[in-house]
Amino acid sequence: DYYQPARGINRNLCGTPSVIALSAFEEGLNTFDGVDMNDIRDKSMALGSLFLELVMDQCGEFGFDLASPKKAERRGSHISLTHDHGFKIMQALIDHGVIGDFRAPNIVRFGFTPLYTSFQNIWDAVEILANIMDKGLWKDPKYAMRSKVT
């Protein structure tokens, strides 16, 4: 009957947020003061629609298919695309500063946080994606290495 701490990083797991973490959380909530949730949702839909339009225009030839609903009103603040080489493509995007998500077997997912994602961010991300696809940068073997977190 004695305490035996977990090994490795698991020793630092805690189920109760610290006072410092809660104060940071409270400050984060202040971001929403005076913000209309309808405005946030409208921008979210506009960001996603712009992304989808640009991807279809600039990357349509590269084998992407839409996995999310096409209508903005029917989807959340993200767009999911399928591609046979989705994992490698997402790793190349991350390496080039575009942070998205991969879900097996072939889904690349892009989230749009309207409070701090700009329309310019969308243009830049799609330009990077088009460059990666056009030049075949995703084919570099380093992008095939899998880790626990994608």
Protein language model features and the residues they cover:
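Conserved small-domain helix->loop->beta segment predominantly found in fold-type I
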Residues: 8-14, 32-82
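Short alpha-helical functional segments enriched in proximate histidine and acidic residues
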Residues: 28-31, 54, 132, 136
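A short glycine-threonine-serine/GTX helix/turn-capping micro-motif
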Residues: 1-19
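PLP-dependent enzyme catalytic core of the Aspartate aminotransferase-like
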Residues: 92-150
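Well-ordered alpha-helical segments within folded domains of soluble proteins
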Residues: 19-27
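Short amphipathic alpha-helix segments
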Residues: 55-56, 86-93
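Helix N-cap motif at beta-to-alpha junctions
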Residues: 82-87, 116-119
